[in-house]
A protein has these predicted regions:
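Membrane-targeting alpha-helical segments
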Residues: 1-81
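Generic structural signal for short, solvent-exposed loop/turn connectors between secondary structure elements
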Residues: 1-2, 123-125, 169
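Arginine residue identity/basic-tract feature
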Residues: 21, 27, 107, 134-136, ...
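Short amphipathic alpha-helical patches
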Residues: 32, 36-49, 62, 74, ...
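Short glycine- and Lys/Arg-enriched binding-loop motifs that mark or flank ligand-binding interfaces
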Residues: 64, 68, 116, 159
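Canonical alpha-helical transmembrane segment with a positive-inside/aromatic-interface signature
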Residues: 71-133, 139, 146, 151-152
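A membrane-cytosol interface segment of integral membrane proteins
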Residues: 137-169
Length: 169
């Protein structure tokens, strides 16, 4: 019974680490991704060694392994959201008047804002471009929403930013 529990929880840890490692590597953090990969493989080797011993007599080990894998994916995604690693670009399209108001509001929160002229269907617009850490995403979207400014907001993952204001790695 203890073997099943170890397989289940070790697989959760291993797959969660895999999720974090992949996110780190795709965001350019090769060093940290490699370190996590080292521990990930150690855990995997332990799990496989534990699992393969007596698998014919205890085929439920496969179900335990698969369950740990599924739970690990779910928990890994939750961890990745909580860690909010990396950067995002937020584009907010607003009226000309609201563009300057919103830019000032964001700058008071120590956010670098670039204002670009844009053309809507019926009128001129302003597009505000913000490059921020993902950890600030919810805070800034709430700030824009709470300002009661009618904005069209889009978010994009950003791999690398050179220069700019207010962003430190």
């Amino acid at each position: 019974m203890l073997g099943f529990i170890i397989i289940f929880f070790a697989k959760i840890v291993e797959v969660s680490l895999t999720t974090i490692r992949i996110v780190l590597i795709t965001r350019g953090e090769k060093f940290y991704g490699s370190i996590i990969g080292f521990f990930e493989v150690l855990i995997w080797l332990y799990i496989i060694g534990t699992m393969l011993v007596g698998i014919n007599e205890a085929p439920l080990k496969m179900i335990t392994y698969a369950s740990g894998f599924a739970c690990g994916n779910y928990i890994g995604c939750i961890l990745e959201e909580k860690l909010a690693l990396g950067l995002i670009t937020i584009n907010a399209i607003v009226s000309v008047k609201d563009g300057y108001t919103l830019a000032e509001l964001l700058r008071k929160e120590n956010v670098g804002v670039t204002i670009v002229n844009a053309k809507g269907l019926k009128e001129e617009k302003k597009m505000l471009i913000l490059h921020v850490k993902r950890k600030r995403k919810c805070e800034l979207i709430k700030l824009i929403s709470d300002s009661h400014i009618n904005a069209v907001i889009s978010l994009m993952d950003t791999k690398t930013i050179y220069g700019g204001y207010g962003i430190r790695k």
